[in-house]
């Protein structure tokens, strides 16, 4: 770390490689990869990289920045968050749930097994409307956060059913580099729902097919049969009835953006087209050449527009590549999707990967559903504030 290395980079359309002097250093791996305003009032925080030692502090920094930009409501995206450190899940939940309330319970099989309630630690408590997004890739610590928010009616949960990983396990080392993983307890939401998905009537296929099915986290038909609710119904503070043993079921279900084979091919074509476009290699559109990224730029709606002339040139470019199997007709049938992917790649090339991701979310059906849920989330937040106010009087 701290030493220098010279790297040669060959770019599309470049006459010769470009040399850069780079100083070696640590590569940061934050829990929150992106945060920005979805519109003038709704902020977005993408907590996708697990729960690490800095997660709660990262959330505070992101929220502080969004509030400066006028945020009045927050969408916390826990989709594809596979979990992580339990104390950080408690800390994050504590930002929205008042001190002393149970966040998660740990219960063993018998009365002699370990049993404990982990409670909100207090500190900064945010009172703005909250929507939490989950999907079949949301597991463990992310389910603990979503479950507590849902049970207490502090916010709405939007998306598709979570993975359902709620086991407390210990690893006992064995010879030859092996080990035995022993399940000692289960996690339960504050109102008593088991987070662990019940596969007692299922198979190993059902377990692994849950998070990667074509329905964005909804179990395949065989898995649905295996996870029919068996426990007692639980009524949350928000007035909804849910069962344990199936992960977290969203308050409002929304399908993910479907990625068909055609859309994968269009995404690939958009990448190569914008690569040449920003290198100044698309004749007639040399003004799109981008020498370097402008990381400090805050992307706003309408910043990147794809004129019809540029889209027509993309169609020519894509059809000209005989290997991708694209035709003018099937590209036109997905014109809106293709334009979105071109905008995404342009935003990435001009500004940053975060800017490109922001463009992608503009047409994400689950994000759009979360935005539509803000008024209901606002009503829930007002009820919580009214209860807290009455308690103080």
Please describe what each predicted stretch is.
Residues 1-177, 186:
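Cleft-lining beta-strand/loop regions that shape enzyme active-site pockets
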Residues 7, 17, 22-23, 27-32, ...:
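Sparse, context-dependent recognition of short Cys/His-centered cofactor- or disulfide-binding micro-motifs
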Residues 21-25, 35-38, 58-63, 92, ...:
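Generic preference for flexible, low-structure residues
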Residues 40, 80-81, 119-120, 156, ...:
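Generic detector of intrinsically disordered, low-complexity, polar/charged segments
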Residues 45, 181-182, 243:
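Generic recognition of long tandem-repeat/solenoid scaffolds
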Residues 55-62, 67, 88-92, 99, ...:
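Stable alpha-helical elements in mature extracytoplasmic
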Residues 141, 147, 153, 160, ...:
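Polar, glycine-rich mid-to-C-terminal structural blocks
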Residues 194-195, 199-393:
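Conserved functional hotspot residues or short segments at active or partner-binding sites
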């Amino acid at each position: 770390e701290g030493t220098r290395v010279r790297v040669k980079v060959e770019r599309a359309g470049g006459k010769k490689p470009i040399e850069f002097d780079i100083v070696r250093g640590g590569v940061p791996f934050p829990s929150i990869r992106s945060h920005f305003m979805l519109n003038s009032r709704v902020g977005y925080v993408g907590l996708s990289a697990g729960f690490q030692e800095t997660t709660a502090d990262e959330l505070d920094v992101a929220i502080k920045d969004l509030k400066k930009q006028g945020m009045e409501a927050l969408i916390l995206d826990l989709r594809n968050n596979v979990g992580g450190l339990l104390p950080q899940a408690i800390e994050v939940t504590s930002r929205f749930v008042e001190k002393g309330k149970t966040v998660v319970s740990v219960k063993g099989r018998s009365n002699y097994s370990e049993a404990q309630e982990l409670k909100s630690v207090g500190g900064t408590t945010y009172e703005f409307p909250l929507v939490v997004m989950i999907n079949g890739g949301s597991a463990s610590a992310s389910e603990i956060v979503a479950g507590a928010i849902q049970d207490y009616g502090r916010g709405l949960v939007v998306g598709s059913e979570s993975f359902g990983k709620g086991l407390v396990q210990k690893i006992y080392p064995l010879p030859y580099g092996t080990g035995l993983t022993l399940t000692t307890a289960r996690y339960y939401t504050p109102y008593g729902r088991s987070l662990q998905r019940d596969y007692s009537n299922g198979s190993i296929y059902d377990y692994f097919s849950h998070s990667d099915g074509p329905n964005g986290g909804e179990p395949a038909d065989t898995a649905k049969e295996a996870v029919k609710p068996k426990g007692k119904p639980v009524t949350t503070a928000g007035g909804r009835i849910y069962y344990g043993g199936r992960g977290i079921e969203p308050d409002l279900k929304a399908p993910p953006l479907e990625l068909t084979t055609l859309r994968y091919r269009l995404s690939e074509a958009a990448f190569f087209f914008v690569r040449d476009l920003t290198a100044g290699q698309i004749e007639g559109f040399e003004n799109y050449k981008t020498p370097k990224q402008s990381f400090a730029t805050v992307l706003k709606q309408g910043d990147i527009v794809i004129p019809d002339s540029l889209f027509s040139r993309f169609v020519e470019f894509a059809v000209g590549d005989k290997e991708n199997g694209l035709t003018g007709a099937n590209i036109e049938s997905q014109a809106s999707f293709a334009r979105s992917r071109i905008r995404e790649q342009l935003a990435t090339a001009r500004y940053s990967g975060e800017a490109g991701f922001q463009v992608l979310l503009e047409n994400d059906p689950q994000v759009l559903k979360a935005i539509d849920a803000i008024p209901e989330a606002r009503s829930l937040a007002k009820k919580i504030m009214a209860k807290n106010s009455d308690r103080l009087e």
